[in-house]
């Protein structure tokens, strides 16, 4: 059985290493601002779908979460602020790809 707590903590870590700060978490209805990693993970795990929002240099990205997918597919999509620089978006995408590669390897 997949430990989604570990999966989401890992995703947050990969984004933080890329310089993105966790700024909010949503359970699909309500949002908590400036959560700790534990608060964010607990909040999102309280539902089947949620999101984690990050910021870097004033630009935001949101990772959409579905609980129940394979670990590497838990983050199923991204949204971003429209004026985000290509370099910043690539840094987030690269972190997401590295995270997926890690979980794909662990699931193999």
Name what the model sees in each region.
Residues 1-46:
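Negatively charged, low-complexity tracts enriched in Asp/Glu with abundant Ser/Thr
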Residues 12, 89-93, 97-107:
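Residue-level detector of alpha-helical secondary structure
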Residues 2, 24-27, 39, 54, ...:
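Intrinsic disorder/low-complexity signature
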Residues 19, 26, 35, 41, ...:
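Intrinsic disorder/low-complexity segments
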Residues 15-18, 24, 58, 82, ...:
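Prokaryotic Sec-type signal peptides and long signal-anchor helices
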Residues 7-10, 16, 60, 72-74, ...:
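A general marker of short, structured functional hotspots
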Residues 46-92:
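Intrinsically disordered, low-complexity regulatory segments enriched in Ser/Thr/Pro
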């Amino acid at each position: 059985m997949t430990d989604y707590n570990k999966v989401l903590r890992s995703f947050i870590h990969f984004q933080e290493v890329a310089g993105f700060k966790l700024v909010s978490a949503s359970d699909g209805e309500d949002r908590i601002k400036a959560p700790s990693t534990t608060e964010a993970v607990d909040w999102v795990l309280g539902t089947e779908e949620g999101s984690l929002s990050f910021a870097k240099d004033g630009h935001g990205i949101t990772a959409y979460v579905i609980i129940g997918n394979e670990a590497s597919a838990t983050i199923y999509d991204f949204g971003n602020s429209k004026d985000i620089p290509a370099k910043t978006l690539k840094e987030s995408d690269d972190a997401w790809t590295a995270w997926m590669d890690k979980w794909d390897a662990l699931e193999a």
